[in-house]
Amino acid sequence: LSSADISRRNAAICQLSFETGLRSVDICNLRLSDVDWKHNVIHIVQSKTQRPLNLPIRSSYGNAMVDYLLKERPRCNEDYFFLSAHAPYAKLNTTWHIVRTVVFAAGVETVGRLTGTRMFRHNVASTMLRKGVPLPAISEELGHKCQDSTMVYLSTDQETMSSLTLPLPKAGDNE
């Protein structure tokens, strides 16, 4: 997928979502004032849980966000970070179509699979699990109140999940 195939806004949205697992609604609600470039952190209150979340800005999506801000974002008084591509400029209502279009253009098979930012949230959770990150930290990163919610995201990672289970004794073993 070349940079000519995707707008800077869409690239930044997908990179941010892919690496952080942020919900679509939180990306849409992200404001310029939520991004602390001096300390390289994004401060938000998650829409679904009302829990604060502080995400370190990684260079990969941070650079994509800066590229969008400097080269493509419309010059206007709107505080939302990601805006519609055409006037009147306003906050986005969803990122589903953006992510779906980019995933399709990249040739990712989506039949029978999750699409949109939920696919990226599952990927973030599974990647963290494979790296040995403890469940409470994964829950925190995804902004879940309850670790049971995180388990839904991890249940698709069968190989890693099965390595974490304790072996059960065979039936009839009295030891």
Regions found by a protein language model. Give the residues of each.
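Conserved catalytic core of the tyrosine transesterase superfamily
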Residues: 1-175
